[in-house]
Design a protein with these regions (language model features):
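Structured, charged N-terminal subsegments at the starts of enzyme catalytic cores
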Residues: 1-25, 39, 43
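Catalytic or ion-translocation cores adjacent to nucleophile or general acid/base/metal-coordination motifs
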Residues: 22-196, 200
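Active-site phosphate/pyrophosphate-binding segments
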Residues: 198-208
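Single conserved hydrophobic/aromatic residue that forms the stacking wall/gate
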Residues: 206-216
Length: 216
């Protein structure tokens, strides 16, 4: 159950409420039981920035904690590439997506929750498209846990799966990329690299704000 435009904790909890109304969620001996797989989807720049805090609050909720126990402490999170690009532009969107994945992954590990990040990518570059294997290799080390999921948009289905040979090659590249990132050891300069990118984005933000003031 993907919750588009998740803005708050209540957006997630209301799914359990609706499930209870329609018999999809039950309580047995004080424990919540459901086949629903609740997947909050964060799409705007503001939501990507607030997602770690919202998830942290959600994990402290007793009802949701019972849901996680029912799912063997597993949580799936979806990130929207298309809307975040439309909202903040290519650079800001990718910066926010990268930071969000790092913080969410650290939060999951801290709370002993197994997780999978679902990448809602489009077909074009501006919508998060591109080669899947390179996209996997570029993900932060923190979220490389062997679990991954991503969308295949209609416009690229024929291109990637139109022939058995190309489809096989595409899947081989995905599996290869996954194996590479799982074997790759943590590098000490990863955090310094992230800090460097953060400084660049802050400088760009300052320049943008200064330009807005001059125009006004």
């Amino acid at each position: 159950y993907i919750i588009s435009m998740t803005h708050s904790k209540s957006d997630v909890l209301e799914v359990l409420f609706l499930g209870k109304l329609f018999g999809l969620v039950t309580c047995t001996r004080g424990s919540l039981v459901t086949d629903l797989n609740i997947v909050p989807l964060y799409e705007t720049i503001a939501d990507l920035e607030s997602a770690p805090k919202l998830l942290s609050d959600l994990f402290q909720d007793e009802l949701y904690d019972s849901y996680l126990n029912n799912k063997n402490r597993f949580q799936e999170i979806m990130l929207g590439y298309s809307d975040s690009n439309k909202d903040g532009g290519f650079g800001m969107a990718n910066f926010s997506l990268n930071n969000c994945q790092i913080k969410i992954s650290e939060l999951m590990i801290k709370n002993n929750i197994d997780f999978r990040i679902f990448h809602g990518r489009g077909g074009s570059i501006s919508r998060g498209g591109g080669k899947s294997n390179k996209a996997i290799l570029s993900l932060p080390d923190e979220c490389q846990n062997g679990n991954i999921r991503f969308t295949e948009q209609g416009e690229v289905v024929n291109y990637r799966y139109g022939s058995s040979q190309i489809a096989k090659r595409h899947l081989e590249q995905i599996v290869s990329a996954q194996l590479v990132v799982l074997e790759k050891s943590k590098k000490e300069d990863d955090k310094s690299s992230n800090n460097f990118i953060t400084q660049i984005m802050l400088c760009l933000l300052y320049t943008s704000d200064a330009a807005d003031e001059l125009r006004s």
